[in-house]
Amino acid sequence: MDRLTIRGDRFIDSAGRQVLLRGVNLGGDCKVPYPDGGTNHPSDFADHRDVSFIGRPFPLAEADEHFGRLKSWGMNCLRLLTTWEAVEHAGPGKYDTAYLDYFAEVARKAGDYG
């Protein structure tokens, strides 16, 4: 998608056409670890510092399928959700850099689809 500008109350593309944003929230399940949420198994529930959110909203191997489908439905806007627990679940100042790398790759792939 081209860079948009604002004219009055409208989004305008580089050709001067009005653009209607059609989009979705992606990642409604982002608040729980992957794959099973880590809260529905008694053995996992207490170990909140040793979880992974890599795979939320979906595994990278499935990204093309999901983004292609959204584009085919006419979506041109995406709100990619995450939660702070995914970034700092191990404790204050302990960032999950593997998750941040995963999330950056999901965002990059989304950009490939406009």
Model-derived segments and their meaning:
Residues 20-24, 78-80:
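Hydrophobic faces of well-ordered beta-strands that scaffold small-molecule active sites
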